[in-house]
Amino acid sequence: DGTVDNSNIHIVNSELKKIPESIMEQFQKNGWHIYVTDADINQKFYQGKYSTVLGTTQYADKKIYIANTSQAATESTIHEVGHFVDYSNGFLSDQEKFKELYLSEVRIYIKAYDAVCVRDRKELFAEVFWQYLTNPSKLQLETPGLYFYMKNTLHTFYSF
C-alpha cells in the first residue's frame, strides 16, 4: 500500500524457500500472490478485532498479506501459505481426523509454542504446517498426532 522495508521482503522470500517446491508451484499456478504491506492488517481486514495481526490470507482474492515487520515476515509467511494448503485441498482442517486432533492436542500446542493466534482449527492447521516445515522434531515431541497428521497429509498431496 505504501513503502515497505526491503529487508522484510528478503525475509519473506527466505521463508518461502523453506516450503516444498510442489506447494509453491501450485500456489503460483493457481494465481496466488504474496504482498508485504505497511497497512494495518488488523484494521483493514478485521476492523480492529484482534490485538495484533501479522498476516492474513484472503481466499477470494487469492492474496496473502504480510505486515511490514521482521516478526511478521519470519513468523507468518509459512503460516499463511499453510492456509493456502488447507484451502486448496478442500479445507483439510474441517475433516474429522483433524477435528479429533484439534480436540486432543490444541491445548498442548498452544502451551508449547505460546501460540496466541490459535483460536480455531484453521489457525492450528496453519501453525502446524509452519512448525512441520521449520522445526519438525519439536512438533513431533510436543504434539506427535499433529506431526504425523501433517507429515502424512503433505506427503499425500505434494512431492518433497
Task: Label every model-predicted segment.
Residues 1-160:
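Active-site-flanking segments in enzyme catalytic domains
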